[in-house]
Design a protein with these regions (language model features):
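N-terminal low-complexity, Pro/Thr/Ser-rich intrinsically disordered segments
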Residues: 1-12
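Conserved aromatic-histidine-acidic binding/catalytic patches
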Residues: 13, 17-20, 65-68
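Amphipathic alpha-helical packing elements
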Residues: 16-20, 24-57
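Compact alpha-helical subdomains of small soluble proteins
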Residues: 40-86
């Protein structure tokens, strides 16, 4: 599966995300973590991202440091986290 959004390469607006189904918003938020090798403890998220050829689970939650996110990811994650009620 290809990434849902290029959240690491461009700034999105709240309006761009609001038209998406809640599941897509939830996955897009977690895709930012997955891009950096976050190992999901949630089985559904883990299985979804394992189906993505680009996903390489390398870092568990205890060792994950969100300072790895670039400025695009930080801004987009803030919007997605506010919208994610899944």
């Amino acid at each position: 599966l290809e990434p849902l959004f290029e959240t690491d390469k461009k700034y999105y607006t709240k309006e761009e995300f609001e038209s998406e189904p809640m599941l897509v918003i939830h996955l897009a938020k977690n895709e930012i973590y997955a891009r950096h090798g976050y190992i999901f403890t949630n089985e559904d998220l883990y299985n979804y991202f394992m189906g993505c050829i680009w996903y390489s689970p390398t870092c568990d939650a205890a060792d994950f440091d969100d300072s790895i996110f670039n400025e695009y990811e930080k801004a987009n994650l803030e919007i997605l986290a506010d919208l994610d009620t899944y």
